[in-house]
A protein has these predicted regions:
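Conserved N-terminal subdomain of the carbohydrate kinase-like
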Residues: 1-60, 241-258
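A short acidic, often aromatic-flanked loop/helix-cap motif at beta-alpha or helix-coil junctions
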Residues: 8-12, 126, 158, 186-187
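Structural motif corresponding to alpha-helix initiation and N-cap regions
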Residues: 13, 42-44, 100-104, 134-135, ...
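Short, hinge-like loop/turn segments at secondary-structure boundaries
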Residues: 19-23, 104-107, 133, 167-169, ...
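Alpha-helix N-cap/helix-start capping motif
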Residues: 34, 121-122, 196
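Acidic, amphipathic alpha-helical patches
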Residues: 46, 107, 188
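Conserved beta-alpha-beta core of the PfkB/ribokinase-like small-molecule kinase fold
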Residues: 55, 61-166
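Conserved phosphate-binding/catalytic region of the ribokinase-like
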Residues: 78, 134-258
Length: 258
């Protein structure tokens, strides 16, 4: 569904990204004040959407906007959950939107409704005060809340233009961890959006196959290929992703051309 804002002063939120190069880190500046998302109401959403949706996904960025955007996201989570929709949530913590204490207090309110939870190890430790190994951290979220699946990306930055990427997924139902070998020495054109690409791939794999290993493979492949694309949206298709997964799993000869 696409919900449009027809008000005279409607606008879309903007962010400005300044690329970094060692030793200077990249910077993001948000310009979201008075954007349409801050004025949306639950009544703007067609009622049929709550009955016909397999999965609802949102993130800590929306909650971090505060005010009406936060209220709307929480209302959506609760209403979708009432109608049996799977709830997916990515913490996606941004320190220039809110403090760690504010994020934790808000997110812990919605975790009882979440089925699929995306949270990095660093965020789990710094924002939620978790300790132990990443496996213990993931399992603890499922022990504290009725979460079914926890996914955490793992990135090693060799240089700003050379990264390794993989992830680990925990299934509470199976009490099992899923991993694969990392995508090593990724030539980074632009890393912005790789986290969202991972989430989209993981959710596709999970919904399509009902399999956490497939979720892991599609998530990792989507994130890896996103690094090769300028901008915050990945440009690819299903066949290319399947090919990347197959090549990643093949330890033999790799062709340089398709």
């Amino acid at each position: 569904y696409l919900i449009e804002d027809h008000s005279d002063d409607s606008r879309v939120g903007i962010y400005y990204y300044e690329y970094g190069s060692y030793p200077r880190k990249p910077r993001v500046v948000y310009d979201r004040k008075h954007s349409s998302i801050n004025h949306i109401e639950i009544s703007d959403v067609p009622e049929t959407m709550f009955y016909n949706t397999r999965l609802f996904h949102t993130s800590g960025i929306t909650l971090g906007l505060g005010g009406n955007a936060q209220k709307f996201a929480i209302e959506c989570i609760k209403k979708f959950k009432e109608h049996g929709t799977l709830i997916s949530f990515d913490v996606n913590y941004r320190a220039n939107l809110w403090s760690g204490e504010e994020a934790r207090a808000c997110i812990e309110q919605i975790l009882p409704y979440v089925d699929i939870f995306f949270c990095s190890e660093d965020t789990a430790r710094l924002t939620f005060g978790k300790t132990g190994t990443i496996e213990e951290i993931q399992k603890s979220f499922c022990e504290d809340y009725p979460i079914s699946v926890v996914a955490s990306t793992e990135r090693t930055v060799i240089t700003p233009k050379k990264h390794n990427f993989t992830s680990i997924i925990y299934s509470a139902k199976e009490d099992k961890y899923f991993r694969e070998e990392p995508y090593n020495n990724i030539d980074v054109v632009d890393r912005i959006g790789s986290g969202d690409a991972y989430v989209s791939g993981a959710l596709y794999g999970y919904l399509k196959y009902k399999d956490c290993q497939k979720a892991l493979e599609y998530g990792n492949a989507m994130a890896a290929i996103k690094h090769s694309v300028i901008g915050d949206m990945v440009s690819t298709d299903l066949e290319e992703i399947k090919g990347i997964i197959a090549e990643h799993q093949n330890t033999g000869y790799h062709s340089e051309m398709n």
